Curated annotation (Swiss-Prot):
Heterodimer of a large membrane-associated beta subunit and a small pyruvoyl-containing alpha subunit. The record marks 251-252 as: Cleavage (non-hydrolytic). Its cofactor is pyruvate. The modification Pyruvic acid (Ser) is found at residue 252. It is a peripheral membrane protein. Keywords: Cell membrane, Decarboxylase, Lipid biosynthesis, Lipid metabolism, Lyase, Membrane, Phospholipid biosynthesis, Phospholipid metabolism, Pyruvate, Zymogen. GO terms for biological process: phosphatidylethanolamine biosynthetic process. One of its GO terms (molecular function) is phosphatidylserine decarboxylase activity. GO terms for cellular component: plasma membrane. This is Phosphatidylserine decarboxylase proenzyme. It catalyses: a 1,2-diacyl-sn-glycero-3-phospho-L-serine + H(+) = a 1,2-diacyl-sn-glycero-3-phosphoethanolamine + CO2.
C-alpha cells in the first residue's frame, strides 16, 4: 500500500492540483467556508483556544484561518542572547551535522546542501561541516514562521521544483525530496555567522509568503531567481528573534542550516518530537 501511495505522487498533476486547492482556499464562500473550517478543526484537533480569533465565522476564507494569528503571549520567546529558538510549531524530522555537504532526509536517504540552496556551490561551502535541522509542520499546527535569532537578510532565493507531499512516508521513499520540491531560501547574517531558513513547498501548499516581499509563490517559475538585500538603509530587512518572517498557506517544512561551530542543539531536540515556536532550539557556542 505504501508503494502505491508513493507511486501516485509521481502521477498526480502536482502543480495543477495545488493551483486548484489554492484558489478554493482563497475563495470567500460564506457558510461553506465556515463549515469547512469547522470540519478541519475537528478532523485535525486544532487548538483554537490560543488563536486571536477563535470563532470560525471570523475567517472569510480558509487561508485566513490557516494563517491565523495567536493571542498575545501565546508563544513567549525564550530569553538570552545565546538562546536560539524554534521558528515554528512543528515536529523534528531530522537534525545533526552536515557531513561532506550532505543532510539526512530519512534513514538511508541523504540530500546535498548545494541542491537545497538552488545549486549555489559557493553558498553551500559556507555551511560545510555545519549543522542542520528539518522541521515538519502538520495540518493542525500554527503556520506562521518566525526568526530563531536576530538576523539581517542577505539574500532570498526562489527555487522551482516538484510538489511532492511531505510526510514520513515520502521522506523515506522519495529521493532528494527537500532538494526537488519548490522552496524559498532565506540567508541571514547573524552574530554567529550565516544562517539559512528554507521554506519548502508541497502538494496543495498554495502559497509561500515572506513579510518583506509578500507572496513569493505562486506564480510558480521555471528557473532559480535571487534577490539581494543591503545590510543597512531603507531597503534592509533586519528582524529580531521571535519576529514573524514568513508563512505557509497550507503548510510543509522549514529547514535551518548553521555554519561550523556556531551552535549546539538544545538537549530537548529529538527526532519525532513536537516543537513549540519560541522555545529553546539551540545555543550559540
Amino acid at each position: 500500500m505504501d508503494k502505491i501511495k508513493v507511486g501516485l505522487q509521481y502521477w498526480i498533476p502536482q502543480h495543477g492540483l495545488t493551483r486548484l486547492v489554492g484558489k478554493l482556499a482563497s475563495a470567500e464562500a460564506g457558510g461553506l467556508t465556515t463549515a469547512v473550517i469547522r470540519w478541519f478543526i475537528k478532523q485535525y484537533n486544532v487548538n483554537m483556544d490560543e488563536a486571536k480569533h477563535s470563532d470560525p465565522k471570523h475567517f472569510k476564507t480558509f487561508n485566513e484561518f490557516f494563517v491565523r494569528e495567536l493571542k498575545d503571549g501565546a508563544r513567549p520567546i525564550a530569553e538570552g542572547d545565546a538562546v536560539i529558538t524554534h521558528p515554528a510549531d512543528a515536529c523534528v524530522s531530522q537534525f545533526g551535522p552536515i557531513e561532506d555537504g550532505q543532510l539526512i532526509q530519512a534513514k538511508g536517504h541523504n540530500f546535498s546542501a548545494q541542491e537545497l540552496l538552488g545549486g549555489d556551490a559557493k553558498l553551500a561551502e559556507e555551511f560545510q561541516d555545519g549543522s542542520f535541522a528539518t522541521l515538519y509542520l502538520s495540518p493542525r499546527d500554527y503556520h506562521r514562521v518566525h526568526m530563531p535569532c536576530d538576523g539581517t537578510l542577505r539574500q532570498m532565493i526562489y527555487v522551482p521544483g516538484d510538489l511532492f507531499s511531505v510526510n514520513p512516508l515520502t521522506a523515506e521513499n522519495v529521493p532528494n525530496l527537500f532538494a526537488r520540491n519548490e522552496r524559498v531560501v532565506c540567508i541571514f547574517d547573524t552574530e554567529f555567522g550565516p544562517m539559512a531558513q528554507v521554506l519548502v513547498g508541497a502538494t496543495i501548499v498554495g502559497s509561500i509568503e515572506q513579510v518583506w516581499a509578500g507572496t513569493i509563490t505562486p506564480p510558480r517559475g521555471n528557473s532559480v531567481y535571487k534577490w539581494d538585500y543591503p545590510a543597512e538603509g531603507d531597503k534592509a530587512v533586519i528582524l529580531k528573534k521571535g519576529e514573524e518572517m514568513g508563512r505557509f498557506k497550507l503548510g510543509s517544512t522549514v529547514i535551518n542550516l548553521f555554519v561550523k561551530n556556531a551552535i549546539a542543539f538544545d538537549e530537548s531536540m529529538e527526532n519525532g518530537k513536537p516543537t513549540v515556536m519560541g522555545t529553546p532550539y539551540a545555543h550559540q557556542q
